[in-house]
């Protein structure tokens, strides 16, 4: 039961942060922003937790907070909307989102690893 509470608590924080971003960032960019920031942060946290046993903190931050801050379902819905109007735009959107998020996660991971060595 404790794990459910940790994930739910993180999720409340994450979705609140995402909603805050939705209020101040243009509708066209907000999902790209939250997914890139979330991926970057996930890279940092993955590197941090790699050799540390903090299962509860990891659940709170990764599954709960970042899982609700980032959003694959909204990305999929936006992609479908773009696809119905312009398949070329949809393809570009999918490529930019996917590669940007992967790159952000990688950069976050590398930065954290380099910081640990310093």
Describe these PLM feature segments.
Residues 1-118:
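Membrane-interface helix-loop junctions in multi-pass transporters/channels
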